[in-house]
Amino acid sequence: MAKAKFERLKPHVNVGTIGHVDHGKTTLTAAIATVAAITSGGEAKDYASIDSAPEEKARGITINTSHVEYDTPSRHYAHVDCPGHADYVKNMITGAAQMDGAILVVSATDGPMPQTREHILLSRQVGVPYIVVFMNKCDVVDDEELLELVEMEVRELLSDYDFPGDDTPIIHGSATEALKGSQEKYGQPAVVELLNVLDTYIPEPERDIDKAFLMPIEDVFSISGRGTVVTGRVESGIVRVGEEIEIVGIRDTQKTTCTGVEMFRKLLDEGRAGENCGVLLRGTKREDVQRGQVLAKPGSITPHTKFDAEVYVLSKEEGGRHTPFLNGYRPQFYFRTTDVTGAIQLQDGTEMVMPGDNVEMGVELIHPIAMDKGLRFAIREGGRTVGAGVVANVHV
């Protein structure tokens, strides 16, 4: 049992395969798990077990996703692979599988294809911070110049979307050969090289506890003789008794001081990321605070009404709308704990949005909400979810 405990001490990093259909994402996922099992222990996975991705729900949307775990000597990886293009779109927009870095799989025989571009754009929009490239099927390309040409195209495409194309690691290999156990350069050695690149190129992600304090307010109580208590789950950081905090969103930002933290009816010195707690606020009246606001470290987050978003619109089969919507559509946007009405501005050239589409749009809310790039939300109509989105940019 001691071994399992030791594994947990390794830093944990979330990655995933992205890229065009049939370029070899699932085969590469199986090859990585197999090679990592040989080099660092763990469970080898075959193609079939990864390909039969189970359904899961995120923000009311059904997504097919496979989760594979593997180790390198220095890290533990959780890797997500999706069977279909629509699953990738949904996964990235809902944040069901947040990625610290992505492995872009590009077939050397085809070069970049439409979904290659779309997945790079999505990565930029939803805030995937790092991309590494695995050029697959190199074993069937005889012409070295063709490999160089494809590599150049991939680098240009990454640069088009503000990724550092010139400095991105690109590994040439063959997932099929690696899965067969080949020791040729495109076989298992290429996957070993990919694992090294993941370890060195993708930095260790900042843990929630090390980020600035933020707690979405779920409920507000007034306790006689003590003052106002707000409850919620701490999203990030730590709040300590005696610290100054801000109440952000919906109304003008207010400053207050945390005079107590309670969890399970016990008084604590601090509330930490992941914990459900009550925070006692000095001098704040019950009617000055409401669900949908957040408590935050002063200056760490600002309220906005206007933002750009990347949105996935549910299909009719997923319980979404049966009809398209047009410019000026006014649904509710559900951020963290509350709904806020907002108007949608479609991009020039987009007349309407059909159920099942993914689309970039501008939004203007009727109340400001504490937000940053990367914040997820649901779009609702009369309490049912009709879309999911992520903030791509905020406007001051």
Curated annotation (Swiss-Prot):
**GO cellular component terms, semicolon-separated:** cytosol
- The UniProt record gives the binding positions of Mg(2+) as T26
Enzyme class of the recorded protein, top EC level: hydrolase
Q: What is its EC number?
A: 3.6.5.3
**What is an example of a GO molecular function annotated in this UniProt entry?**
translation elongation factor activity
**Region entry G3, spans:** 81-84
Q: Report the subcellular localization.
A: Cytoplasm
| Similarity section | Belongs to the TRAFAC class translation factor GTPase superfamily. Classic translation factor GTPase family. EF-Tu/EF-1A subfamily.
Name by which UniProt lists this protein: Elongation factor Tu
Organism of derivation: Psychrobacter arcticus (strain DSM 17307 / VKM B-2377 / 273-4)
Q: What is the lineage of its organism?
A: Bacteria, Pseudomonadati, Pseudomonadota, Gammaproteobacteria, Moraxellales
